[in-house]
């Protein structure tokens, strides 16, 4: 009697090319980001501020208008505006990301920029809070902001933290995309880093909150620093706050 479990299966009645007709075509290979970094040596700022959210991009908009400041580096992906690096103060740089970045590029971008070409002492990331990633109900008419820190930042003494007076992101809530990749990269390199997520995505009260955090914190004493007053939308597609790629 034949053993139906261990017996070799009979040959398929279909040809190989016939089976392939039911297989969806492979997605096209996306070109890797193109980095333009004219510096001979890695940059070593004391502070690197990364603006991902529309609010933070609006706040730093006066520093993104050419020819106000020279660009130190730029990184370009297909169908997106370039990521640019520019000086903000003598000791701090601004990395602006004006377009949504595909999730499969996030860790590659974070690894390319932090630790190789840019070696900061500390990193501050601004991103929007995604309602689909938040455990709880967000107020519709109230500005809120939370932070996540690396282990090195948590060990910093009071009065020396990057974001003073800001509550931690509630347990059970998640962060994804480029913001999470930057924070993970800083954790891997044992860098002091904080991620600030804010809500609503487009609101002047959030802009005022972030400006106050900066002027009373890491940018204290930078009186000549100009901040934007208009909330700009920077072409974010389909509202990043409502399309999470965490489980895709």
What do these predicted ranges mean?
Residues 1-139, 188, 245-247:
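N-terminal catalytic or cofactor-binding beta/alpha core of small enzyme domains
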């Amino acid at each position: 009697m034949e053993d139906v479990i261990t017996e070799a299966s009979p040959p398929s009645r279909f040809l190989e090319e016939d089976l392939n007709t039911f297989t969806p075509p492979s997605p096209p290979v996306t070109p890797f980001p193109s980095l333009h970094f004219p510096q001979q040596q890695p940059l070593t700022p004391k502070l690197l501020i990364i603006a991902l959210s529309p609010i933070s991009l609006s706040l730093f908009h006066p520093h993104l208008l050419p020819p106000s400041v020279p660009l130190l580096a730029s990184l370009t992906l297909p169908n997106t505006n370039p990521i640019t690096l520019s000086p903000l103060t003598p000791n701090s740089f601004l990395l602006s990301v004006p377009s949504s970045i595909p999730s499969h590029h996030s860790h590659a971008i974070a690894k390319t920029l932090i630790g190789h070409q840019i070696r900061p002492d500390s990193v501050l990331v601004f991103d929007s809070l995604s309602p689909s990633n938040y455990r709880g109900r967000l107020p519709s008419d109230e500005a809120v902001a939370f932070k996540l820190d690396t282990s090195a930042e948590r060990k910093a003494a009071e009065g020396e933290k990057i974001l003073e007076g800001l509550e931690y992101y509630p347990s059970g809530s998640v962060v994804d995309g480029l913001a999470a990749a930057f924070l993970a990269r800083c954790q891997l390199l044992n860098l002091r880093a904080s991620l600030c997520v804010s809500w609503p995505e487009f609101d002047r009260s959030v802009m005022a909150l972030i400006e106050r955090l900066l002027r009373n914190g890491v940018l204290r004493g930078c009186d000549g620093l100009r901040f934007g007053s208009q909330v700009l939308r920077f072409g974010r597609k389909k509202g990043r706050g409502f399309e999470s790629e965490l489980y895709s």
